[in-house]
């Protein structure tokens, strides 16, 4: 694991021990789609070679967010794992890649991959039932991280606060987001634990709406597993949209 739990991949800067830890790696899995552009350089620094970096995102039917209120230019959301259907596809890709690298371990990877997919299928059915109360509700996020979850479970992401991760929105964009939050019916505003939320806090105050938190990255004590991550997102939606 290169990126420690709780860190924002957009701001990550490789440390010497991260480089050293990859020196003997046979395969490096990355998200791609602009989330971890440092992965290729990190592999080169470690002597692992670019060919050993396997980007998963481009294989997951990336979602292109629309222009307009969302941000001035289209953006691609790299957080494909928030959709359990794509997560199951990711398991298949991982099993195939690992089996190709280690053919003798193939039966083990396929067995474990099958068990994980069954768990994710059950999770998807659980959240699908839970999401019936959210149908067509509107959400505003700090940055573009919930388009896949929203598409899977019938939500509408109608605005993104930051035009790009870490970028300050313009006054015009802030005003448009405030208008969106005020409705009618008003959209729910979400920040994220890995990112600074001062702008989102100011927006919530200006619009007179609550500020909710959702974790699309996971890794912390409340989202240590994939299932906990998705259930955590679902709980956040329940708390904001019921």
Region locations from a protein language model:
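Extracytoplasmic metal-acquisition and chelation regions
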Residues: 1-242
């Amino acid at each position: 694991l290169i990126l420690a739990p709780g860190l924002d991949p957009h701001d990550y800067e490789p440390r010497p021990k991260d480089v050293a830890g990859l020196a003997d790696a046979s395969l490096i899995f990355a998200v791609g789609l602009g989330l971890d552009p440092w992965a290729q350089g990190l592999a080169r620094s470690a002597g692992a070679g670019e060919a050993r970096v396997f980007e998963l995102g481009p294989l997951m039917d990336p979602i292109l967010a629309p222009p307009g209120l969302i941000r001035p230019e289209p953006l691609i959301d790299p957080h494909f794992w928030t959709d359990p259907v794509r997560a199951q596809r990711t398991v298949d890709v991982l099993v195939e890649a690992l089996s190709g690298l280690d053919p003798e371990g193939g039966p083990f990877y396929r067995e474990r991959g099958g068990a994980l997919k069954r768990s994710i299928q059950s999770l998807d059915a659980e959240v699908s039932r839970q999401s019936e109360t959210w149908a067509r509700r509107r959400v505003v996020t700090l940055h573009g991280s919930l388009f896949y979850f929203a598409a899977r479970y019938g939500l509408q992401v109608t605005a993104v606060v930051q035009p790009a991760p870490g970028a300050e929105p313009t006054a015009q964009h802030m005003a448009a987001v405030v208008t969106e939050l005020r409705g009618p019916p008003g959209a729910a505003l979400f920040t994220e634990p890995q990112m600074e939320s001062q702008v989102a806090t100011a927006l919530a105050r200006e619009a007179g709406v609550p500020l909710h938190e959702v974790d699309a990255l996971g890794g912390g004590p409340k989202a240590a597993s994939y299932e906990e991550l998705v259930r955590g997102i679902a709980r956040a939606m329940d708390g904001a949209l019921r």
